[in-house]
Amino acid sequence: MTLADDLTRLFEHRSFQDPQPDLDGKVIMVTGGTGSFGQHFVRRVAARYTPKKLIIFSRDELKQYDMQMAFPPSKYPFMRFFIGDVRDAARLEMAMRDVDYVVHAAALKHVPIAEYNPFECIQTNVIGAQNVVTAALRRGVKQVVALSTDKAANPVNLYGASKLASDKIFIAAGNMAGADGTCFCVVRYGNVVGSRGSVVPFFQRLAAEGAAELPITDDRMTRFWITLDQGVDFVLSSLALSRGGEVFVPKIPSMRTVDLARCIAPHLPQRIIGIRPGEKLHEVMVPEDEARSTLDLNDRFVILPSDDPDLRAHFIARGGAPVPEGFVYSSDRNGERLDARALQSLLGISLAA
């Protein structure tokens, strides 16, 4: 059996490509659109759909320039680039004119940076979420999907707490929208292989620079992992599934950080440096307290508002099953683990992408 076979077996029902939304002829806006997710999202949407417009909204002029070079108008005539910050409510509202779908990916997401700059973290992750909701409601956007993180479940750091607050804002926004207004949902997933600032390129850079060792915070530490392609497909399929008020959680494998380091640089020794402030030993995506509101949808879980029995009935009719009382979906209890062969294959696919 080849490495590709191992990975195919592991993700056999986890491509997250079904169902798909109808984005042909639609206007789509991505906040934080110049990041790793945004660029993969553009490629995915361009390959599958013929959108009327795809608006990239971000605050970094250089990244916007680089992305315009990577996506030239001759090949991507539907692309539009807006300089703006989610902290700027007026600019957001201007950018959302005639927009059908918003994918909210803008965030300050690095744990130590958020801890050291708490006011900035709150302004972007919490006030920014409020501004996105307000602009979407005022502009009559059809659907908004907000990207979250496993760190928002039982948070122990400011980044996680700010994303939990953001999640609550988006879920509660449905109450302001009314029955025929904007539909809001949240997607919550783990670490993205190869994304900017993640541990994979960090380990790769150390190995390439001739480091004598790789720093490991704790040899027991585990994390959920997902590829960029899977992340984009999960967002798109959740957009198609959503009726408003859900938190969608993908079923994805876990791995130990020490195994990841060993696959990237098997020749380098590892040095335990201790868990940093705000870090968890293991991550959780469905806490026990949310189990009673959670349904199993085969390739994902959906956490529902406790006050919406009609929404629960809708997903049960689609084959959703309640999870057991006391259920917890955490990286250390996850039954799906990446072994060395599958991990190497996963890294190879990520690097090729």
Question: What is each PLM-predicted segment?
Answer:
Residues 81, 121, 184-187:
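Hydrophobic/aromatic anchor residues within beta-strands of the central parallel beta-sheet
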Residues 49-63:
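Conserved glycine-rich Rossmann-like NAD(P)H-binding loop of the short-chain dehydrogenase/reductase
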Residues 26-47:
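N-terminal Rossmann NAD(P)H-binding glycine-rich loop of SDR-like oxidoreductase domains
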Residues 1-25, 138, 172-353:
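Strand-loop microenvironment adjacent to phosphate/nucleotide-handling motifs in alpha/beta enzyme folds
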Residues 44-53, 140:
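Conserved S-adenosyl-L-methionine
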